[in-house]
């Protein structure tokens, strides 16, 4: 990746569901981005997504020319014609070519992405789980995310499209289904113009070390001692209670 290349991006038909008289001091209950369009000059690529409250609803695969829903269930309630996205991207490409010819271009500032890896649910050995690689603060939106298992590349992972943020950077999430084992470790590999070299974010299951026989013996002995002390203390209190209450039963009027 060459960080010196020029990247320009545009957004058309970007709608934010907020109050008509709103301002920065008014917080919206829900925010939706309809038709976020991005086209980049480094290659024939672009992005078209719909988002709601920061979550992707769908994106349009510009190569396959089809709508890809974040959850298949969404397609049962509504639909979207990908031709609209293709027309928007074509318009962006045309306008970008004009702008680059008529203006002095400056290279975009490359941000260093922030990478976090965690499991979807608590790890239990032998139980299927999902690893999540959360890549934040992406700009420009050009990135390659892959997974390594024990140092070797693996396939079968999925990822979201670029999700927009208020600071005009992006985030992207990659998912890898795996079977936890104490013999395996994983790395999320991120390549981006803001990095001098590929970044590997390491993850391996945190399995409590088994107690040694000596530790088990000590724990059992302590438990037994505590139990015996409790019995002795309880017996002493019972005897004292009987003694203090005994004479009162023999007292009477003369």
Curated annotation (Swiss-Prot):
Belongs to the MHC class II family. Residues 240-254 are cytoplasmic. InterPro entries: Ig-like_dom, Ig-like_dom_sf, Ig-like_fold, Ig/MHC_CS, Ig_C1-set, MHC/Immunoglobulin, MHC_I/II-like_Ag-recog, MHC_II_a/b_N. This is SLA class II histocompatibility antigen, DQ haplotype C alpha chain. It is found in: Membrane. Residues 204-216 are annotated as: Connecting peptide. It comes from the Eukaryota. Gene3D superfamilies: Class II Histocompatibility Antigen, M Beta Chain, Chain B, domain 1, Immunoglobulins.
């Amino acid at each position: 990746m060459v960080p010196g290349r020029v990247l320009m991006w545009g957004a058309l038909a970007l709608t934010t569901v907020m109050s008509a008289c709103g301002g920065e001091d008014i917080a919206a209950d829900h925010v939706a981005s309809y038709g976020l369009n991005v086209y980049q000059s480094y290659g024939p690529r672009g992005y078209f997504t719909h988002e709601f409250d920061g979550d992707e609803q769908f994106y349009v695969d510009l190569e396959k020319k089809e709508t890809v829903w974040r959850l298949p269930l969404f397609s049962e309630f509504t639909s979207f014609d990908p031709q609209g996205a293709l027309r928007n991207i074509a318009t962006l490409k045309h306008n970008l070519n004009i702008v680059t010819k008529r203006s002095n271009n400056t290279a975009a500032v490359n941000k260093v992405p922030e990478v976090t890896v965690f499991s979807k649910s608590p790890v239990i050995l032998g139980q299927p789980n999902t690893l999540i690689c959360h890549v934040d603060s992406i700009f420009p939106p050009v990135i390659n995310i892959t997974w390594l298992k024990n140092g070797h590349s693996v396939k079968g992972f999925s990822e979201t499209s670029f999700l927009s943020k208020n600071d005009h950077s992006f985030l992207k999430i990659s998912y890898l289904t795996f079977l936890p084992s104490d013999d395996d470790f994983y790395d999320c590999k991120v390549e981006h113009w803001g990095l001098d070299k590929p970044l590997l974010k390491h993850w391996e299951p945190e399995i409590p070390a088994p107690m040694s026989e000596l530790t088990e013996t000590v724990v059992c002995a302590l438990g037994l001692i505590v139990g015996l002390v409790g019995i002795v203390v309880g017996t002493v209190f019972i005897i004292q209670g009987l003694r203090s209450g005994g004479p009162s039963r023999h007292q009477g009027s003369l």
